Amino acid sequence: MLKLNLQFFASKKGVGSTKNGRDSQSKRLGAKRADGQTVSAGSILYRQRGTKIHPGMNVGRGGDDTLFATATGVVRFERLGRDKKQVSVYPA
């Protein structure tokens, strides 16, 4: 009598898991209006975390540190001393 000896081998190697492959959604921070641009009151000028840029004349700061125009006018990004920056809105 014939004895069959069948052996099956794995066609694919066992695949391990990876610890990569995740990323958070971008928060779209940064300047929303350019220097010299005309804005109306309430327009968002700069979205930021912390006070990278400080509010100047006719600019308010929101709870999440967003800078917005409190009056209609022209946007100006300015230096405050050696290491600070501010954004102001001057009436047109």
UniProtKB/Swiss-Prot annotation:
Give the top-rank taxon of the lineage listed in the UniProt record for this protein.
Bacteria
Q: How is it modified after translation?
A: The N-terminus is cleaved by ribosomal processing cysteine protease Prp.
Q: Which GO terms describe its biological process?
A: translation
Q: One Pfam match, by short name?
A: Ribosomal_L27
Q: Where is this region: Disordered?
A: 14-34
Any one GO MF term held by the record is: structural constituent of ribosome
Write down what this protein is called: Large ribosomal subunit protein bL27
